[in-house]
């Protein structure tokens, strides 16, 4: 058994992070010392590493908590329950990718319509016009029509 500072060091996180995980019921100390300090064990270390790996895959704290609960009572749950969590996350990621692709395409279109000249003022900038909802010059770059 070891104190919070040792667990933080072993996992490469701050003690504040561990307290946050504890507050959000992702981990619980294995016990307390006679003087009241939280004590942790190897199981806690594995839980923290599980949390960190899950976070690196984009899972939310709620999703991680649900997965940890399933892991702790694995014989009472199915792989299908676990897979439903990751499948839902994949669907959300795909939606975000689609939205970001749409945004990138629209931004690239207005960006390409601008000449980007340093010596020209922005009074006829096609990017500003497009963002203001104004008609952008008929395919010409913003500085070419002058």
Language-model regions, residue ranges each:
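Basic helix-turn-helix/winged-helix DNA-binding cores
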Residues: 1-71
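C-terminal regulatory/oligomerization modules of transcriptional regulators
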Residues: 75-146
